[in-house]
Amino acid sequence: MNKSSSASTVPPHSTPHTAHSTSSSSLPPLSSTHHTNTSSTSNNNNNSNNNHNHNHHHTTAATTTTSTTGTGTTAATTSTSTSSTIPINTAGIHTSNSNLATATNTPSSSPQVSTSVERRFWMNDRGSRRSSTSLTQQPLTMNRSSNKLHAAVSARDLTRLKQRLSQPRKAKIELAEYDSMDQTPLCAALRNGSHDIVREILFFYQSNKMDINDQDKSGYTPLHVAASHCDDQILMLLLNYEGINVNITNEDKNSALHYFCQKFRSPNCQEPFSIFLKKGVNVNAQNKNGETPLHKSIFNNTVRLLMVNMLLDAGAEVNVLNSRGESPLHFAVRLGREDLVSVLVKAGADITIKGNEKKTCYELSLTIGNQRVINFLKNVQDIFNWLKSIDLEQYWLNFVKEEIFMDLLLDIDERTLDSLGITYSGHRLKIIRNCRILRDQQLLSTANSNVTTGSGSSGSTTTTTTTTTTTSGCGGLNVPENKKVTQLSIESLKSNPPNSMDSTGSISSDDLKESLTNLEHWVIDHSELEYTLKLGSGSSGKVYKGLYKGKEVAVKVLKSITTQSQLEEFKKEFQIMGSIRSQFMVTFYGACIEPKLCMVMEYCSRDSLYHVMNTKKYDIGWDRFFQFTMQMTLGVQCLHNWTPQIVHRDFKSLNLLVNEDWECKVSDFGLSRFNTADNLETLSKIRGTFAYCSPEVAVGNGSLYTTKSDIYSIGIVFWELVTRVINGEYSRPYSEYSHIKMDFQIMLNSKEGLRPTLPQNTPPGLEALYKQCVNQEQTLRPSCEEIIETLNRLRHEYMSSKTTWDSLIRKLPSLSPPPQPTTTTTTTTSSSTSTNNINNNINNNNNT
């Protein structure tokens, strides 16, 4: 669809945009109103209008005939006060229009306009540019060399600081003085990131009733500085300070939240943000350019998607317009981020809004050229136009939120309408009827195409279908069978032995920094990472979904390392993951040291094997059982055959991750150890989850954790999978024993020989393999090679007797609705029975 056709089909808004050109486009008015630029009226105590000699002098945004100089003096300006278009580069920085082609590889016809919106670091003449959220950088001429508090802060000398603070009269005077960077001692400490020093100064402020909300000449408070420069721990010291005012704005009308949303870098942004909310922050405050915190969050290069989602959850208005008539959606389109565009549209962003460039977001996306953004916005407009054609456009957002676009209308059924929240029977019938019309039209079109190309025959209709190989282990998911590991043998492993380290078997005892220096090619610059979604948390830290060099990754952010033992844990996991390369292990991309310790790994979209087994919609059969058990055993074998040998020590279904292609991979090596003389002490400690812990380790008498301890854990995961396949639902190990209620009871009973009980109709070969793996005597447990050999033999047995094996599976009641009677001469089959299945089968659904 071209631009002109797009514009011509969009209906007018019910509410016109004040001071902005209105659209004649076809998307509906939304419940949220379009806000024009109305600067926030939040508290701004004692905000001085005196010029402040910083690099962020306030300049009026105006069309210029002569460029603005670095001192903030404009050679010539018109009397009109407007801000310029805000194109976006790949770093998320507002740029001038002259650089739009550089940022987006597309030409720009808009005139270059001087503005105060986010331009620093884009041009080489950085001193002549300043951001509406840029803090003080250039020094003043005054020098407070006699200020002992400033000297202590600069030297990060906590002892000298305490000594000076012990003299309240002098300290109060010095705390109010500015240094050569025109900052108070508190602001200097905030910029330096000195947690203990900040805490001491704040305690002095509180004890002496000093004003924590005191503003400098440009209106900045300590909270502005902290929100822009500090990590989560220091920022929360300010936010938790009694009497802190989170809504004070500076001369550019930016609140601390504007800075926080644009500049905060830590993935732990939820905690400080929640304190902002508790303090009554205005999430819709607009600065002088009309930008809200939601606008600003688009420019956060590290946690932008996390920020956007938090703001939307907190009630941020998605259709607030800045002085250029642009909403946050325009910013996301310029950035070329389909994920951001999707989140904003699903939150109700109106794609028909036209900014000063007279373009809707879809038209703007065509000039930017990002195909994924273009496709998404076109899908949104197409589904709306179709719903409008049947007078049901009020449901367009229901469809968009579930990503039910035109290509999936053919598969809509009653259950899909339930998931869309469409309850009115007349509307449901109308949608189903019109979807059937679309289906018949497609069949007719296909038939005519076949006749034209000679693929059809007279009097008959031939529909071309795409056949996808599926496994019985996935039911209706239509997941392509993984052919890499369905028939692996010991011989193939011998021909491709695992790699080995070049070391002599000893592990370096150097500190973390030296370890990373030795593996410096694994060190990742934190600026190359972006966090997009929190996936979970555990005892060792939090895990986020993110982006690294444009690739989806998982980022494991470790908790602060305060002890030597924690340092050793990180070093071991880093060394192990940096040493091993195997298709059966989660790929390791590298680690970051600052500002947070984190490890960057392959992202496995289906979560852990534990979560896969707990998801009832997944029909896990014997094919999937053999695939998973083979892959996990090959992963453990890779560890056991390494030089020096590695034992996992925490093998369980939660530490087996499943990617989009249904490949099961071993992960989480935080407890893993190289099996060397240096690690004898740690190998004798009880580690791992109790149900998966072998009895010799559970006894706690100092027995070494060996490779056979890992084999025991493999046996317990085998039990989980066998039980899930046969019973059709997940059960926890030992859950059949009513007398076992506590974890320690599992350990006591396992050392007495008690084991989880397999279903009665378990195939004898699988039962024998399970019992070998969990044998009380570790020397009688099989090796990984023996397990693989047995699995290959049992899989061959299954392939030869599929009917017999499948008859052992207990059939659960069908979740599908009963078949509807056929009312037409043409029978149409839909392979999707739910919205989730529709989304999973975009490329696999065929109608015959």
UniProtKB/Swiss-Prot annotation:
Bias type Low complexity, positions: 1-52, 60-85, 95-116, 452-472, 822-848
Enzyme Commission code: 2.7.11.1
All residue ranges annotated as the SAM domain in the record: 378-441
Species, as recorded: Dictyostelium discoideum (Social amoeba)
GO terms under cellular component: cytoplasm
Active site: D650 (proton acceptor)
Region of interest (Disordered), residue spans: 1-117, 448-478, 810-848
ANK repeats: 181-212, 218-248, 252-285, 289-320, 324-353
Pfam families membership: Ank_2, PK_Tyr_Ser-Thr, SAM_1
Annotated GO MF terms: ATP binding; protein serine kinase activity; protein serine/threonine kinase activity
Domain of life from the UniProt record: Eukaryota
GO biological process, one term: signal transduction
Binding-site residues for ATP, renumbered to this chain: L535, G536, S537, G538, S539, S540, G541, K542, V543, K556
Gene3D superfamilies: Ankyrin repeat-containing domain, Phosphorylase Kinase, domain 1, Transcription Factor, Ets-1, Transferase(Phosphotransferase) domain 1
Name of the top EC class for this enzyme: transferase
Protein name (Swiss-Prot/TrEMBL): Probable serine/threonine-protein kinase DDB_G0278535
Family: Belongs to the protein kinase superfamily. TKL Ser/Thr protein kinase family.
Enzymatic reactions: L-seryl-[protein] + ATP = O-phospho-L-seryl-[protein] + ADP + H(+); L-threonyl-[protein] + ATP = O-phospho-L-threonyl-[protein] + ADP + H(+)
Family annotation (InterPro entries): Ankyrin_rpt (IPR002110), Ankyrin_rpt-contain_sf (IPR036770), Kinase-like_dom_sf (IPR011009), Prot_kinase_dom (IPR000719), Protein_kinase_ATP_BS (IPR017441), SAM (IPR001660), SAM/pointed_sf (IPR013761), Ser-Thr/Tyr_kinase_cat_dom (IPR001245)
Domain Protein kinase, chain residue ranges per copy: 529-799
Keywords: ANK repeat, ATP-binding, Kinase, Nucleotide-binding, Repeat, Serine/threonine-protein kinase, Transferase
